[in-house]
Structures are given as structure tokens and as C-alpha cells.
């Protein structure tokens, strides 16, 4: 599943980063978005972008465009 499709309150475990742009890939890796990390959607801005997520005991705001490059499996 593409992580840009997650709804508020849903959790997913990152399985793959599909990013050809090394700069964006490095940026996400530097922020802790790595394979195996658990992500929870905390809130979504009124216009749908950006998305506030929680991972590794901190929160980040990511654009939907960046989240669309991250694959994961939903955790129930």
C-alpha cells in the first residue's frame, strides 16, 4: 500500500522506498523513514496536504507527494 492512502489513526510498517531522486531519498532517511519503521497518521491538513505522522517517538509533517513514494503494510 502507498502510504499517502492512509487515513488518520491508521498505522503502517514501511516496506519499501520507491524514490529515484537521491536528494529526497536521503532527506527521508535522515528523518528516520527507513524500512521496518512503524508510522502512524496523526492528522491531515484541511486541503489534504501535508500529513502529520508519528514515528520513532516524534512527529513529522510530510507532503503527500513524498508519502506516495513510500510503500508499507497496514498494521491493525
Locations of the language-model features?
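Short alpha-helix capping/helix-loop boundary micro-motifs
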Residues: 23-27
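C-terminal structural segments of small proteins and small subunits
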Residues: 45-76
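Short, acidic/hydrophobic/Gly-rich beta-strand patch recurrent on exposed beta strands
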Residues: 15-16, 30-32, 52-55
